């Protein structure tokens, strides 16, 4: 993503790169950029994965921009004049900037409308993002390249990260762009999809087996859309723990502290975006401590799909099948709350075999993934 060429790519005969305005509401005149970004994301997801299950919506962009105490975003758009003279977003880029940790780091994402690829738009967006990252004083950048299926090494060149887990086709446009700009493949994550409904009794059986393995020292709690006040601090501790334990290989991601205020800020952001969630957590009864949790997140205007988010078990309580327990109980709750959902998507690092094994046991199937590239801003 990062070379030192200083050619002027902010404008082109057919399109131009500009900062994305932040509207007060989605019906405001300035909302054209957020609506356009959402359409680019939708078309890009369909082109790569064949579905729009995980495509960012305009309301997601608005809600995240309204809640930036912990993560700030600098958004840019590539725009051309549409048939009616209105701006048409043909590509976009964003630099995600941690505000309470990782002051050295920017996570960068670029997407171009499929009909407008191979015109230099992606390179122009990358160059402008490089300038933004430098302006923000960040020294390291991470970028992901999505792919719909793991490549066949026997039939095409592939790249394998230093972890030795997973691979990505060397000829993918996102891979080529990352390498062109001096970034190195560090990690591959797997996207998995669980088709619903599960065979009758599946979640119940896994939950019963896990409860037996856990024993009487553990109590399960399930919450919808809001975590009770008395558990906020301990829930925040679990989120923090995930940032310590997640197997991120050599990605330069430092622990990211959570507290009760941050949890409530994300509650507010989810509510503003029209999202709901289910969290199942496990309490260690003798100590009164939360020691495991998992979350399912969903957009309420997308009844057919949900996302499996965070799952974490504290190190001292591993080996009791608590990861299986929280997921099984949460899936039972999800079946009651979201009976029309037909798919759950999730992402796991390929070097996390334990969590992948739990997902496979439930019936999650591989559905592509993402390759994470990293490098210095100066390339």
Residue ranges and their predicted role:
Residues 1-20, 127-230, 370-374:
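Acyl-donor-binding surface of acyltransferase catalytic domains
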Residues 1-71, 84-88, 214-261:
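Short amphipathic alpha-helix that is part of the acyltransferase structural core
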Residues 44-82, 87, 91-103, 243-305, ...:
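A conserved beta-strand-loop-helix scaffold within acyl/acetyltransferase catalytic domains
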Residues 89-92, 99-101, 107-114, 122-149:
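Long, mid-chain structured domain cores
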Residues 98-108, 117, 136-141, 299-309, ...:
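A conserved beta-turn-beta hairpin within the catalytic core of GNAT-like acetyltransferases
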Residues 109-117, 147, 283, 310-319:
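A short, internal acetyl-CoA/4′-phosphopantetheine-binding micro-motif in the GNAT/acyltransferase core
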Residues 118-134, 313, 319-332, 361:
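Conserved acetyl-CoA-binding loop-helix of GNAT-fold acetyltransferases
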Residues 292, 320, 326, 353-370, ...:
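Conserved N-terminal glycine/acidic-rich loop preference
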């Amino acid at each position: 993503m990062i070379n030192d060429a200083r050619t002027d790519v902010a404008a082109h005969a057919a399109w131009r790169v500009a900062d994305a305005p932040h509207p007060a509401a989605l019906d405001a005149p300035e909302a054209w950029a957020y609506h356009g970004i959402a359409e680019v994301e939708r078309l890009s997801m369909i082109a790569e994965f064949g579905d729009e299950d995980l495509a960012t919506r305009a309301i997601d962009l608005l809600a995240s921009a309204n809640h930036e105490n912990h993560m700030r975003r600098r958004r840019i758009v590539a725009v051309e004049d549409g048939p009616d003279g209105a701006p048409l977003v043909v590509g976009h880029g964003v630099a995600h900037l941690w505000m309470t940790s990782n002051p050295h780091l920017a996570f960068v994402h670029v997407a171009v409308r499929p009909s407008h690829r191979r015109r230099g738009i992606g390179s122009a967006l990358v160059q402008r993002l490089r300038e933004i990252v430098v302006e923000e004083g960040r020294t390291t950048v991470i970028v992901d390249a999505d792919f719909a299926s793991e490549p066949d090494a026997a039939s095409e060149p592939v790249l394998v990260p230093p972890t030795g887990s997973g691979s990505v086709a060397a000829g993918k446009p996102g891979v080529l762009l990352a390498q062109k700009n001096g970034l190195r493949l560090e990690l591959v994550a797997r996207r998995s999809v669980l088709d619903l409904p599960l065979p009758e009794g599946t979640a119940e059986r896994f939950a019963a087996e896990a409860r037996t393995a856990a024993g009487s020292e553990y109590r399960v709690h399930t919450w919808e859309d809001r975590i009770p006040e008395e558990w906020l601090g301990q829930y925040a501790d679990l989120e923090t723990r995930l940032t310590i334990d997640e197997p991120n290989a050599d990605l330069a991601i430092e622990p990211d502290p959570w507290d009760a205020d941050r949890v409530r800020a994300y509650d507010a952001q989810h509510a503003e975006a029209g999202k709901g969630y289910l969290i199942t957590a496990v309490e260690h009864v003798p100590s009164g401590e939360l020691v495991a949790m998992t979350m399912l997140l969903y957009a309420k205007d997308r009844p057919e799909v949900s996302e499996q988010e965070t799952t974490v078990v504290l190190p001292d309580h591993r080996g009791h099948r608590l990861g299986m327990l929280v997921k099984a109980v949460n899936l039972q709750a999800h079946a009651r709350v979201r009976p029309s959902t037909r798919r759950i998507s999730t992402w796991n690092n390929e070097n996390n075999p334990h969590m992948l094994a739990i997902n496979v046991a439930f019936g999650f199937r591989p559905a592509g993934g993402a390759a994470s590239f990293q490098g210095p801003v100066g390339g």
